[in-house]
């Protein structure tokens, strides 16, 4: 029996679809702020908000609550340490911190709020110096008060300067002399140093007003309770270019050869 041949309808041609890839607009590019040096995407609200916060802290310092930190007091007169501009006859050691224009506080390890506030400052500091972000244990962790301290300079309700220092043991032999001219360490000479300046910073708009020197003097007199140290006993940790200039002004010594030396530690 012959098979029946079925008529087939002509096949419709397959409709092809073209895929399109969407790329981000070219306008979503990085912009680098000329003042704070932060790079951010100008079309990103989150990036812009982060830049605004970073920019404000970098230029003007961090807004500081009066409850953060313990004000340093002169052990003889019981007066707060203040710059000459605010330490006249109207300055009283019994006044509240919030009523004072300028004062210096130290950070207590274990007090979460003030340690966190100081950490925000250190984030800026380490970014500026291209320094490691994991060198805060000696001043921030509870039970480490014998290892170092952090101090903050407060002006008009903002933290405009900060310094962190390590306590150095003479037996550790960490002191060195650094030649100012070449930034090379002098071999086989180990000076006696007692304090290591790990970081020092002043916000951009307050630089050139002596705040860094006041912080250094505070550390020199009060970092070791009841024991003032000499300037040359304060050593620097790999000072930056600006830090090297500060160190040269503050505690460099002139060798008999005529060369200037800065105390450093390793």
Swiss-Prot record:
Domain spans labelled N-acetyltransferase: 108-266
Enzyme nomenclature, EC number: 2.3.1.-
GO molecular function: chromatin binding; protein-lysine-acetyltransferase activity; zinc ion binding
This protein's GO CC annotations: chromatin; nuclear replication fork; nucleus
SUPFAM superfamilies assigned to the protein according to its UniProt record, in alphabetical order: Acyl-CoA N-acyltransferases (Nat) (SSF55729)
Zinc finger (CCHH-type): 31-55
GO biological process, one term: DNA replication
Pfam families: Acetyltransf_13, zf-C2H2_3
InterPro entries: AcTrfase_ESCO_Znf_dom, Acyl_CoA_acyltransferase, ESCO_Acetyltransf_dom, GNAT_dom
EC category: transferase
Location within or outside the cell: Nucleus
Keyword field: Acyltransferase, Cell cycle, Metal-binding, Nucleus, Transferase, Zinc, Zinc-finger
Task performed by this protein: Probable acetyltransferase required for the establishment of sister chromatid cohesion and couple the processes of cohesion and DNA replication to ensure that only sister chromatids become paired together. In contrast to the structural cohesins, the deposition and establishment factors are required only during S phase. Acts by acetylating the cohesin complex component SMC3.
Assigned protein family: Belongs to the acetyltransferase family. ECO subfamily.
Protein known as: N-acetyltransferase ECO1
Species in which this protein is naturally found: Eremothecium gossypii (strain ATCC 10895 / CBS 109.51 / FGSC 9923 / NRRL Y-1056) (Yeast)
Lineage: Eukaryota, Fungi, Dikarya, Ascomycota, Saccharomycotina
